[in-house]
A protein has these predicted regions:
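Flexible glycine-rich beta->alpha loop in the catalytic core of nucleotide-sugar glycosyltransferases
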Residues: 94
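Flexible glycine/serine/alanine-rich "lid" or loop that lines and gates the nucleotide-sugar donor pocket
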Residues: 83
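Conserved acidic donor-binding loop of glycosyltransferase catalytic domains
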Residues: 91
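PIN-domain endoribonuclease scaffold, especially VapC-family toxins
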Residues: 1-79, 87, 97, 103, ...
Length: 109
């Protein structure tokens, strides 16, 4: 099976590294953080990134409003997976199992 990630995951990781870099107090810490961020970017070069396209947006907006407590980003990830008929791998089965038509499994625990 092919492995994919989503543009939403890329966004979350990028925001996380940006926040980490902004918190750095010393030049040494910044060098380390930038190097780790660069490694993360290189990792994305080896994997297909699924877009939040019009089909995913439609799927996202079709979810019941009761699911909003799961979180916008997680619901966007779920919408991308649903729109591609993809299996979502996550440890967060409690929330993702509530999403209609989403195939989700935890392969880690």
């Amino acid at each position: 099976a092919d492995a994919f990630t989503t543009i939403v995951i890329v966004q979350e990781i990028t925001q996380g590294w940006t926040a980490e870099i902004n918190r750095c107090k010393t030049g040494r810490d910044q060098v380390r953080a930038y190097a780790q961020f660069e490694n993360a970017i290189h990792d994305f070069a080896d994997i297909t990134i699924l877009s939040f396209d019009s089909e995913a947006a439609e799927t996202f907006h079709s979810f019941p409003t009761s699911l909003r407590r799961i979180g916008t980003m997680d619901l966007k990830i779920a919408a991308i997976a649903c729109s591609h008929g993809a299996l979502l791998l996550s440890r967060n089965l409690r929330d993702f199992a509530q999403v209609p038509d989403l195939k989700v499994e935890n392969w880690l625990d």
